[in-house]
């Protein structure tokens, strides 16, 4: 189970809060809208600098007084805290304590977002991931936080079964969860394929709403194909991920090199 939670957490690491499609969060107001869009730009495609992430968080905080966008404000403050935590952890184990505090803030903001708008599927997806990230830092809390993570993802799926991010994260869970606990590699693969179809249909309608996840869907699709020994399909999926996001370091520097190494070992 912890393997699923850690994998689910990773999918949100450095996720790009780009322009967006409609989502069931609250309606927005013009002044706060501008702050949210500006903050998203500061976060950047791959998290940007630590200063940029803190600046984005400050912009999001200024939107909280606007009841029309408060749910979005809390959502993006949570996303900023989540990505700051990832940045700190990548910089070294000595930052574990500070990262833990940012993940705590992530959960608190997402809980507020769902209190303001109980239909906020995007917030429930990120909340599930945040719980998983907390388990990675403190496995002793796995039993309690694991149930919360599963509950949050289930709620997201109930609210927005065709949301591509919900479908992607559900597929990651299915792919990484052992069969004795209800997981299935085949079910996971089918989920990745469905998520790819849904992302292809996603059309931006509001610059506030999240649309991250398209390139990551192909990264996971490639992983699933490689697990089945279908290396050419895996390579095509990884290349598709890079076509969508050329700076996708996970694919460029980890997944593709691992695939090429596996291919050379299989060569006659």
Spell out what each predicted region is.
Residues 76, 126, 169, 220, ...:
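Canonical tetratricopeptide repeat
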Residues 1-4, 20:
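Positively charged n-region of N-terminal signal peptides that target proteins for export
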Residues 201-268:
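Terminal, low-structured helical/coil segments at or just beyond the last alpha-helical repeat
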Residues 37-58, 80-114, 119, 123-155, ...:
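Short coil/linker segments at helix-helix boundaries
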Residues 5-17:
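Bacterial N-terminal signal peptides
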Residues 18-22, 27:
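Boundary at the C-terminal end of the N-terminal hydrophobic targeting segment
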């Amino acid at each position: 189970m912890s393997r699923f939670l850690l994998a689910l957490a990773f999918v949100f690491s450095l996720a790009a809060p780009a322009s967006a499609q409609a989502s069931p969060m609250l309606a927005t107001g013009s002044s706060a809208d501008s702050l949210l869009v500006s903050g998203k730009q500061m976060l950047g495609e791959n998290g940007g600098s630590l200063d940029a992430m803190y600046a984005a968080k400050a912009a999001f905080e200024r939107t909280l007084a606007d009841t029309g966008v408060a749910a979005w404000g809390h959502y993006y403050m949570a996303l900023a805290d989540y990505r700051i935590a990832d940045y700190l952890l990548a910089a070294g184990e000595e930052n574990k304590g500070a990262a833990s505090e940012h993940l705590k803030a992530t959960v608190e903001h997402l809980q507020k977002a769902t209190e303001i708008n109980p239909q906020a599927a995007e917030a429930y997806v990120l909340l599930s991931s945040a719980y998983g990230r907390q388990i990675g830092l403190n496995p002793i809390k796995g039993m309690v936080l694991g149930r919360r993570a599963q509950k949050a993802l289930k709620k997201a799926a109930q609210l927005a079964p065709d949301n591509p991010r919900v479908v992607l994260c559900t597929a990651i869970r299915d792919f990484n969860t052992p069969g004795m606990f209800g997981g299935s590699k085949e079910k996971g693969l089918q989920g990745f394929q469905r998520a790819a179809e849904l992302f292809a249909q996603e059309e931006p309608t509001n610059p506030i709403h999240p649309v991250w996840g398209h390139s990551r869907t192909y990264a996971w699709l490639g992983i699933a194909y490689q697990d089945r020994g279908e290396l050419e399909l895996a390579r095509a999926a990884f290349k598709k991920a890079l076509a969508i996001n050329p700076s996708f370091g996970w694919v460029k520097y980890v997944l593709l090199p691992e695939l090429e190494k596996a291919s050379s070992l299989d060569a006659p």
